[in-house]
Design a protein with these regions (language model features):
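Conserved beta-strand positions
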Residues: 10-12, 35-37, 113, 147, ...
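Active-site acidic/histidine proton-transfer and metal-coordination neighborhood
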Residues: 19-25, 60-68, 76-177, 184
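A short alpha/beta connector and helix-capping loop motif
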Residues: 186-193
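Short, conserved active-site loops that position catalytic residues or coordinate cofactors/metal ions
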Residues: 30-41, 68-74
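A short, Lys/Arg-enriched amphipathic alpha-helix followed by its capping loop at the start of a domain
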Residues: 3-8, 26-32
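Boundary/entry segment of secreted carbohydrate-active catalytic domains
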Residues: 2-19
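Glycine-rich, proline-tolerant flexible connector loops at the mouths of alpha/beta enzymes
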Residues: 36-60, 115-122
Length: 193
């Protein structure tokens, strides 16, 4: 069923305001060899003439692999939040096609899925069905699909996210665990056992 994956990656939000070369430097100085980036960051670099191969090579030259793309918010049939600014919604409106194009070009092995939709707007079965479809699409690109629980959205707790991953039973279906989200959600630590 599920395989345990324990990895630590520099999260894009820790270096979000730095230029790309400084993101790489901060990642390395913090002792990480992997980092996540937002699709919008990559698209911005592409608009300046850089290719995915250029970006990947520049990271590798600094001893860093971009192993995670974060977030894919458009994976579910309902995805627009009722509590986020329009600017964030637009910045994270990357389609699954575009998201996985970037993942493949950079060699990303993980994708973070956020359930940005309002709590209660989708049933467990609908969420699980959409998650399965996304896992299948991710598998075509060699990407693990890590469902992240975020307290202010549609999957606010570890338990809810785990139930989706467990019920989907996909070989590349995993959880993305964020300690801040765990504490804020008041999730039960026993769920991790």
């Amino acid at each position: 069923m599920m395989k345990p994956v324990n990895s630590f990656t520099m999260n894009y939000s820790n270096v979000v305001n730095l230029p790309f070369v400084e993101k790489l430097r901060a990642t390395r100085l913090a002792g990480y060899s992997t980092m996540s980036l937002m699709p919008a960051d990559i698209q911005g670099m592409e608009q300046t003439g850089r290719t995915l191969a250029d970006i990947r090579s520049e990271a590798a030259d600094q001893g860093v692999q971009i192993n995670r793309m974060d977030p894919l918010n458009t994976w579910s049939r309902r995805w627009v939040s009722d509590n986020m600014p329009d600017a964030y919604t637009l910045k994270t409106a990357t389609t699954a096609y575009e998201f996985f194009r970037i993942c493949e070009g950079l060699g990303c092995t993980h994708a973070s899925l956020n359930a940005m939709f309002p709590l209660g707007s989708m049933s467990h079965d609908e969420i699980t069905e959409d998650y399965i479809a996304t896992c299948k699409l991710g598998a075509e690109h060699g990407v693990n699909i890590d469902l992240e629980f975020v307290p202010l959205w549609g999957l606010p707790s570890l338990e809810m996210a785990w139930n989706v991953v467990r019920d989907a039973d996909q070989h590349n279906g995993l959880l993305c665990y964020d300690i801040w989200h765990h504490v804020r959600s008041k999730s039960d630590i026993e769920t991790l056992r």
